[in-house]
Amino acid sequence: MSSAPRRPASGADSLHTPEPESLSPGTPGFPEQEEDELRTLGVERFEEILQEAGSRGGEEPGRSYGEEDFEYHRQSSHHIHHPLSTHLPPDARRRKTPQGPGRKPRRRPGASPTGETPTIEEGEEDEEEASEAEGFRAPPQQPSPATTPSAVQFFLQEDEGAERKPERTSPSPPTQTPHQEAAPRASKGAQTGTLVEEMVAVASATAGGDDGGAAGRPLTKAQPGHRSYNLQERRRIGSMTGVEQALLPRVPTDESEAQTLATADLDLMKSHRFEDVPGVRRHLVRKNAKGSTQAAREGREPGPTPRARPRAPHKPHEVFVELNELLLDKNQEPQWRETARWIKFEEDVEEETERWGKPHVASLSFRSLLELRRTLAHGAVLLDLDQQTLPGVAHQVVEQMVISDQIKAEDRANVLRALLLKHSHPSDEKEFSFPRNISAGSLGSLLGHHHAQGTESDPHVTEPLIGGVPETRLEVDRERELPPPAPPAGITRSKSKHELKLLEKIPENAEATVVLVGCVEFLSRPTMAFVRLREAVELDAVLEVPVPVRFLFLLLGPSSANMDYHEIGRSISTLMSDKQFHEAAYLADERDDLLTAINAFLDCSVVLPPSEVQGEELLRSVAHFQRQMLKKREEQGRLLPPGAGLEPKSAQDKALLQMVEVAGAAEDDPLRRTGRPFGGLIRDVRRRYPHYLSDFRDALDPQCLAAVIFIYFAALSPAITFGGLLGEKTKDLIGVSELIMSTALQGVVFCLLGAQPLLVIGFSGPLLVFEEAFFSFCSSNELEYLVGRVWIGFWLVFLALLMVALEGSFLVRFVSRFTQEIFAFLISLIFIYETFYKLIKIFQEHPLHGCSGSNDSEAGSSSSSNMTWATTILVPDNSSASGQSGQEKPRGQPNTALLSLVLMAGTFFIAFFLRKFKNSRFFPGRIRRVIGDFGVPIAILIMVLVDYSIEDTYTQKLSVPSGFSVTAPDKRGWVINPLGEKTPFPVWMMVASLLPAVLVFILIFMETQITTLIISKKERMLQKGSGFHLDLLLIVAMGGICALFGLPWLAAATVRSVTHANALTVMSKAVAPGDKPKIQEVKEQRVTGLLVALLVGLSMVIGDLLRQIPLAVLFGIFLYMGVTSLNGIQFYERLHLLLMPPKHHPDVTYVKKVRTMRMHLFTALQLLCLALLWAVMSTAASLAFPFILILTVPLRMVVLTRIFTEREMKCLDANEAEPVFDECEGVDEYNEMPMPV
């Protein structure tokens, strides 16, 4: 302010400090009535000052101020009280209760957008004054330019200067009108009467006036539809300030009472009501410290203000953002049309096809973000708005826009009408049921016609367009055909299939943000409002799906403005979909909190230069840089002060919480040693068996039944494949029937007693390699193979008990990725090698015939071959089916080698491409998953049908006995004598069997414990826990006992176990489009594994069908398992990099963080270990390959740590594999574990 406002001399000052030189000369003096004279002089002095203020315009050049002026200025600025309840409707004033003495004074935040509106406390006495003076208020009269109210106004507050800016919104004190300036001064009685009459004349003369801003608009009389009284109604735009002052003259009472009172009584009333009486404290005028954010409270009884009662807790929710733009429909009528939505990523509506595009990361222009920040800094921000309907919200938004001078008063109805237009969505035209109902907000056009037809003038600034209480419901009779019974609660409709599908992707308890942007020509400049509702409410037919709305953002403006409304709408939508920003929006108390959150968002944003991008490879660094920015953002978030109730505040609480977390992690670690014999086993039993009953109750789910069918084929196919190959390796001593029986019996026992029933136990490649090596060892030393297995089984039980007693399962932590990859790569190479070795052997036994030769001999050979083939097919116990030693297999059959090649290659390619088809783009996801999961059985079935259709070509079939009998009844029985079957078993071999038992135990230990580690990863969210010690004891002990019956040992099959766990995993349907699926729960139960084991055992009854499977088909499955096992092996990927230039290396950690030569050195060391293992496998010492394998563990711990740094080892030997649930092309269970099949 340039100068302090001039002090008007009140009657009180005239009483105590009279100034004789300023008295009117015509005033008579009566010594006997000195007190009355002084009061009269005070009144005259009061009028004189008003006239002087009107003539000088509020500021006198050269005016000097004394201490008395400053003292008066301080007193008046603190004690003057302006009656506010004149705006209150009569019924609301009657309902308002006085403030009790025990209650705290209530305050109401009423800051203007510039932060200048004070918060005023008001008592019941003010309402009485307002009711007494209500009769004098009437619509103002438009003053002439020569006598405008601004020329005669004066101010009593310290923040009101002589040169008042139009945007000031502080409450204005009364002003003197030009009519009062021309009043004659006569005697005391005549003067008082004239004063009262002229004040009445002023009020009546201004009844038909204009406010200068909205013609004919009543400014003071509250409308009947006014729902509540808000102190913010006192705020006016600058053009209305003078008129408001002219309407509030200092009239002590109404006209009828003034005529009955004497002059002294009127002066006393005026002095009491308008002057500063020393010793009497008026209600203080306090500034609002919160700034310009208006916490609007409308539509309720006057009660405790937001500062008096605790604010509703704003717990951040997941958000669903919808962008609506104001566009023209087919009939050229404006409507709000949905153009984009955000669940996590942006989805746009394609303009031509009106369908949703693919989810993508929103790319924003930097200018739109700056424009958004600028509009938020100067626009309307309403936090905790207490409204339940769209009309109520729109009404409050428009009111705030008018108050903050964003729009003119005459544009109020147009903006409100635009906000209440109909909302349309891309899914509306796809629904073939009844069309979408008109929303309550789409009645704006009807309301516009209603006001246009009425004779009333435009409503007051604070008058709602829709009168009545908030509980009023708007019901509209639609002209379209609807079912006769109308819902009682309003117009409703059933959810469409599109809505149900979209609702599944939106997280539970999510709250919506509605963004409304559009171009309107009736505005002269853009206007913005950001609204946060106190409680999330469902707005009828505003959103595409019925989600409660918490936030609204509105941006309207003319097309001439240099602003892209669509891009700004996308910017605020992307901000609201950002986790950090929408949490800040929930917890914001004022505008500055939102601006700070935008700045934090800009700090982590990436700006791309305006250059043309030729390929996606050029953008690889962008993703890396973005990850670094996000990591920095997370670190800064951890350093910030914790939010209330989210994290412990004190250091002591943090330390206590950390101790609890460490204790909980240690308690849940199943590999933690207790230091007591069998301590780990006891902990496993105590941890897992209390859930035993729930393991059966949780199986009552349709998903478990589907998993049984799927896992049955996943377990049967390897059993048949490995059984057929094992029969070939052991000369039918252990074949398909023994492997099927072992899988069934051990599976049933393990599912009933095991600690982790999600494990699927079965035969694997490493055990096949060991069985072949041990059979070769026994054959070369003339030892009985099955009897030697019995003694190995006894030693296995002893080793298992010793390992469990010493809690040795923790040793699995030392088996790193370095050893696992060598092991898996070795088994894959063996599978691939054995496949082609068998195929070459078939070509040797059945060579291709040339075109030359005797026709007779060829005919004879063909005749004998056909007779042999016919015997092979028709007789079930022939040489090719049963493998009896009395008969030889047919040799030299024509076309056998070629057909075997076709069957093997066909089986491999069908199974391999069906696996790829699972994650392709064809067909719905459910159909693709079913086809991909059953790829191996489908491949076997197709190739069996192909072989069955070719009748004149011989192929070797699978050897399966009839019924429950062993594969070779003439060679063995179901029970094996430990002392020897045909010859006594050497005693030295009984003791020496400990060495092969240790080797078998190493294989079973590694496979079982590593598989349990993979299944028990925290990413899988298992709740019932695992038991490493109990599972190892059961599997090894059952294998040792089964050796008495000539059954093979089993271990936890990695791929089948992971497949079983994935089949029982329930994924959350509330997954944002484009986001990775999240685990909701896992059906941890025992029934599926139990049923699968029983079904595998019952597969012996389909022996006739199994006997039709050619061995060449099993070779194709063998090749499939070898090739697919290479996926996910980092060692295999680094072998490719040896032949690749560095510029084509992938963007992975071990490439970026490790120098190329150091990475190749690590690969060479793994390759050297693999070559050593292969050399051992190729010699007579092949039985010792598990021992060589286990030596890679100390090699990695001792030797490699001296060659490579700790950082390099973390990059090259880190276990980064995570559970795979998404449908990425070429990614499945095999990518999750570097373990053999």
Swiss-Prot record:
Highest taxon of the lineage = Eukaryota
| Record PTM N6-methyllysine, positions in chain | K270
Give the matching Pfam families: Band_3_cyto, HCO3_cotransp
Compositional bias of kind Basic and acidic residues: 38-48, 57-74
Q: Biased-composition ranges for Acidic residues?
A: 119-132
Q: Which residues carry this modification: Phosphothreonine?
A: T253
Which segments carry the region annotation Disordered?
A: 1-238, 285-316, 445-466
Question: Where is lipid attached as S-palmitoyl cysteine?
Answer: C1169
Name where it's found.
Apical cell membrane; Basolateral cell membrane
Q: Which UniProt keywords apply?
A: Anion exchange, Antiport, Cell membrane, Differentiation, Glycoprotein, Ion transport, Lipoprotein, Membrane, Methylation, Palmitate, Phosphoprotein, Spermatogenesis, Transmembrane, Transmembrane helix, Transport
Stretches assigned to the Cytoplasmic side? 1-703, 915-929
Predominant cellular place of this UniProt entry's protein = membrane
Tissue spec: Expressed in the choroid plexus epithelium (at protein level). Expressed in the parotid gland and sublingual salivary gland acinar cells (at protein level).
Q: Which NCBIfam families is this protein grouped with?
A: ae
What is this protein identified as? Anion exchange protein 2
Q: Please name the source species.
A: Mus musculus
